[in-house]
Amino acid sequence: MAPKAEKKPASKAPAAKKTTASTDASKKRTKTRKETYSSYIYKVLKQTHPDTGISQKSMSILNSFVNDIFERIASEASKLAAYNKKSTISAREIQTAVRLILPGELAKHAVSEGTRAVTKYSSSTQA
């Protein structure tokens, strides 16, 4: 066998120095904002059960659930608008999508609460 060659430690080159301050400012990363429903879920929890808390894992699961339902309703409403050759999703498409996606009694309650919310919003904007 041939003798092993001796390895010398690799010499490091000195780091290049920055000459201008503008390169520091342009390379500064901004933290991307992630929008969640956490604050709204927490407010509803405190309205219904004031002395109850919620873990981060549970909050994450509920946030995923709300995002999923939102996606389903939005896509169904989009399809309904396309079927009727409309480019705008109105309250009617949302209401029909909710009736199609949510089962039975849950759909009835969701529609009544949604109607109530839209009525409340409409009256507050006109006044």
Curated annotation (Swiss-Prot):
There is a cross-link at K120 (Glycyl lysine isopeptide (Lys-Gly) (interchain with G-Cter in ubiquitin)). Monoubiquitinated by the UBC2-BRE1 complex to form H2BK123ub1. H2BK123ub1 gives a specific tag for epigenetic transcriptional activation and is also prerequisite for H3K4me and H3K79me formation. H2BK123ub1 also modulates the formation of double-strand breaks during meiosis and is a prerequisite for DNA-damage checkpoint activation. Phosphorylated by STE20 to form H2BS10ph during progression through meiotic prophase. May be correlated with chromosome condensation. There is a cross-link at K7, K8 (Glycyl lysine isopeptide (Lys-Gly) (interchain with G-Cter in SUMO)). Residues 1-35 are annotated as: Disordered. Disulfide bonds: none annotated. Transmembrane segments: none annotated. GO terms for cellular component: nucleosome; nucleus. Gene3D superfamilies: Histone, subunit A (1.10.20.10). It is found in: Nucleus; Chromosome. InterPro entries: Histone-fold, Histone_H2A/H2B/H3, Histone_H2B, HISTONE_H2B_site. GO terms for molecular function: DNA binding; protein heterodimerization activity; structural constituent of chromatin. Residues 11-24 have a biased composition (Low complexity). The modification N6-acetyllysine is found at K7, K8, K12. Keywords: Acetylation, Chromosome, DNA-binding, Isopeptide bond, Nucleosome core, Nucleus, Phosphoprotein, Ubl conjugation. The modification Phosphoserine is found at S11. PROSITE patterns: HISTONE_H2B. Its main location: nucleus. Belongs to the histone H2B family. The nucleosome is a histone octamer containing two molecules each of H2A, H2B, H3 and H4 assembled in one H3-H4 heterotetramer and two H2A-H2B heterodimers. The octamer wraps approximately 147 bp of DNA. PANTHER family: HISTONE H2B. This is Histone H2B.2. It comes from Eremothecium gossypii (strain ATCC 10895 / CBS 109.51 / FGSC 9923 / NRRL Y-1056).
